[in-house]
């Protein structure tokens, strides 16, 4: 990793401070100048025929098969949806899956347990299914504990509320059910992360939970482990008596997990399959952009844990295909992101206006990377006597990530990117752009330069996105160009490098992006291309780098002193009366339990306890600069 950083330091992109002042880049000479040779980028040096790149299309197939043009990413992704004989079949049933039908009431299927006469009867172990679900110990695509994982024990945790239970220090039964402990061992996870140490006993004691935790801290396991464990021990409720002609087609899940994006719910579902192995609980996933008929057929096979995006779930509720009357556990994952995406009306309709049990009759777990005013209001309405959990410095990036900021003008970005990719030829790389057109353009450019790349963005179909992600995870296309659709929640093991080709306008988006590397205690590199077009986030960049003990380039300090940055993404911008504060530092209340502040919402005073105050300065919320990210994927990080 240090070799890569050293190579980046040597990149001939000119001195940032000089560029900031408008000076020409050192080492570049017009072709007509005498006495100085023309600059040749490192990725073109030592190549025959003037640096021409031999075509590698024969190695990776034509453009129509994957890495180029509009059909880029068309890779074989069979097995991306486990237990499915047809594309997009995302339930446990189906050909090759955990078995169709009702595993709870009919004859048992491989890997599917039963609940019989008030007792949980786990299925017998199945070697084939275990290999498909958990892989093998030597599988590099399975990421468990990283080299810095023990450092997580030093992360401070603050749990507030009445009667906070003692945290656990290991995955043991009790308090966990023996089956979930076995499945955790199969996943090769040896110790709980800080959020899991607290969430397991909190849920086991019947309490509600509002949790903020730093990126890569195991939030998905933080709710799946205790919810599944309690489900195994307590079993399902009886299905209500039929009412109406179509009531027999309804499913009555015990647990509901809502998350904002297709990618995130798919990854949570993949993890739920692992940890529900051999149990009576059958997980299902539903999301927009995929065939609803296929998803309904999966639901008809049985669904005990439903993972859903709010829009598709609302559609299924209106069709009479899902009943929430048996919900014991409600989980809102990335709650702040769901509200940012405009899902609050759908969420409130689902929770408050459908047949879901009231707040006193269910357990509610809310996980949010940030805690602005609208999330506080949601917690007030959806949770009862909850415990507030703040893990680590939620408002900062992980020190496992080495951050490097390069001053690069827009017309030089492609050349510098090729230099970076040439220096970092190991591991997976994610490149973030701001627009869909740039994502496609850049992936085509990289392909033409001999770098196998694929892209995902909002205009690609779910099938295309799944195939592109499958190719990236497998290493067939080790470079993924992505827009913000993949910035949050997307968890892919062994991502060693994240490049912000285009910096976002908000600092919290930057932190969520670079959080795709350095996960589970592993180390990673994040490179950002900065120029004067990004001066609106310069203050936030400086604070981030300082908090994470990273080098702050001189050109950032210089541009910051000019005082020419704007409010978007900087400090001082407000959203609905409350900015998005940096969490976890000193008197800044972003990751604190607002119930202790006594300041209420939207007060105008100047005390640090005023939440969302328009005049509270550093004592209240500030602009978009809080971060942290729940995730899931091939691991539960």
Swiss-Prot record:
Domain Helicase ATP-binding stretches: 200-389
Listed SMART domains: DEXDc, HELICc
Major localisation: cytoplasm
UniProt motif DEAD box: location: 333-336
Binding-site residues, ATP: 213-220
Entry's Gene Ontology molecular function annotations: ATP binding; ATP hydrolysis activity; RNA binding; RNA helicase activity; translation initiation factor activity
PROSITE patterns: DEAD_ATP_HELICASE, HELICASE_ATP_BIND_1, HELICASE_CTER, Q_MOTIF
Subcellular location per the Swiss-Prot or TrEMBL entry: Cytoplasm
Chain intervals with Gly residues compositional bias: 85-103, 567-589
Domain Helicase C-terminal: 400-560
Recorded catalytic activity of this chain's protein: ATP + H2O = ADP + phosphate + H(+)
Compositionally biased intervals (Low complexity): 14-27, 75-84, 606-637
Leading EC class: hydrolase
Keywords: ATP-binding, Cytoplasm, Helicase, Hydrolase, Initiation factor, Nucleotide-binding, Protein biosynthesis, RNA-binding
Pfam assignment, any one: Helicase_C
Chain residue ranges for the region called Disordered: 1-121, 567-637
GO cellular component terms, semicolon-separated: cytoplasm
Motif (Q motif): 169-197
Transport recorded as keyword: no
Matching CDD domains: SF2_C_DEAD
Family: Belongs to the DEAD box helicase family. DDX3/DED1 subfamily.
UniProt comment concerning the protein's domains: The Q motif is unique to and characteristic of the DEAD box family of RNA helicases and controls ATP binding and hydrolysis.
Function statement: ATP-binding RNA helicase involved in translation initiation. Remodels RNA in response to ADP and ATP concentrations by facilitating disruption, but also formation of RNA duplexes.
Protein name (database record): ATP-dependent RNA helicase DED1
């Amino acid at each position: 990793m240090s070799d890569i950083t050293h190579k980046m330091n040597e990149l001939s992109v000119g001195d940032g401070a000089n560029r900031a002042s408008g000076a020409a880049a050192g080492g570049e000479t017009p072709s007509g100048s005498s006495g100085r040779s023309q600059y040749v980028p490192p990725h073109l040096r030592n190549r025959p025929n003037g640096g021409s790149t031999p075509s590698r299309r024969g190695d990776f197939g034509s453009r129509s098969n994957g890495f180029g043009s509009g059909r880029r990413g068309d890779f074989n992704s069979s097995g991306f949806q486990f237990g499915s004989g047809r594309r997009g079949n995302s339930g446990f049933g189906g050909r090759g899956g955990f078995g169709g039908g009702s595993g709870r009431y009919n004859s048992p299927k491989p890997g599917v347990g039963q609940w019989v006469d008030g007792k949980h009867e786990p299925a017998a172990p199945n070697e084939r299914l275990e290999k498909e679900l958990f892989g093998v110990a030597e599988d590099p695509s399975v990421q468990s504990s990283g080299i810095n994982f023990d450092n997580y024990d030093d992360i401070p945790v603050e749990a507030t509320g009445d009667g906070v239970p003692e945290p656990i220090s290991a995955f043991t039964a009790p308090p966990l059910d023996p089956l979930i402990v076995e499945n955790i061992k199969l996943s090769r996870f040896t110790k709980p992360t800080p959020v899991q140490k607290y969430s397991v006993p909190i849920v086991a004691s019947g309490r509600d939970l509002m949790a903020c935790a730093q990126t890569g801290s195991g939030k998905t396991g933080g709710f799946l482990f205790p919810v599944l464990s309690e489900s195994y021990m307590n079993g399902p409720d009886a299905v209500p008596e039929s009412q109406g002609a179509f009531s027999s087609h309804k499913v009555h899940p015990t647990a509901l997990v809502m998350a904002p994006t297709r990618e995130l719910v798919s990854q949570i579902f993949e993890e739920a399959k692992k940890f529900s192995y051999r149990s009576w609980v059958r997980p299902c996933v539903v999301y927009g952009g995929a065939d609803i008929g296929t998803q309904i057929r999966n639901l008809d096979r049985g669904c005990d844990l439903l993972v859903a995006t709010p829009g598709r779930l609302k559609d299924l509720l209106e069709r009479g295909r899902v009943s929430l009357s048996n919900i014991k556990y409600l989980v809102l994952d990335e709650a702040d992101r769901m509200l940012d995406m405009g899902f609050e009306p759908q969420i409130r309709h689902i929770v408050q206006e459908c047949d879901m049990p009231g707040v006193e009759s269910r357990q509610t777990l809310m996980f949010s990377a940030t805690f602005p005013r609208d999330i506080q209001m949601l917690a007030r309405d959806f949770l009862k006597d909850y415990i507030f959990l703040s893990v680590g410095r939620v408002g900062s990036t992980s020190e496992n990530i080495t951050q490097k900021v390069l001053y690069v003008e827009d017309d030089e970005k492609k050349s510098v990117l090729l230099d970076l990719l040439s220096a970092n030829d190991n591991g997976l790389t994610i490149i973030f752009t701001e627009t869909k057109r740039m994502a496609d353009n850049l992936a085509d450019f990289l392909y033409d330069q001999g770098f196998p790349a694929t892209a995902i963005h909002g205009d690609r179909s779910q099938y295309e996105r799944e195939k592109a992600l499958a190719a990236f995870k497998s290493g067939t296309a080790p470079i993924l160009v992505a827009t913000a659709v993949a910035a949050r929640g997307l968890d892919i093991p062994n991502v060693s490098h994240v490049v912000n080709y285009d910096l976002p306008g908000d600092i919290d988006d930057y932190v969520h992006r670079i959080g795709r590397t350095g996960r589970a205690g592993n180390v990673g590199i994040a490179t950002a291309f900065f120029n004067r077009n990004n001066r609106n986030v310069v203050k936030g960049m400086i604070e981030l780098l300082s908090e994470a003990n990273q080098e702050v380039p001189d050109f950032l300090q210089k541009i910051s002193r000019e005082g020419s940055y704007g409010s978007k993404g900087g400090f001082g911008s407000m959203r609905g009366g409350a900015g998005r504060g940096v969490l976890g530092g000193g008197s800044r209340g972003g990751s604190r339990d607002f119930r202790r502040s006594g300041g209420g919402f939207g007060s105008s005073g100047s005390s640090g306890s005023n939440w969302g105050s328009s005049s509270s300065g550093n004592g209240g919320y500030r602009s978009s600069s809080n971060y942290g990210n729940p995730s899931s994927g091939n691991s539960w990080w």
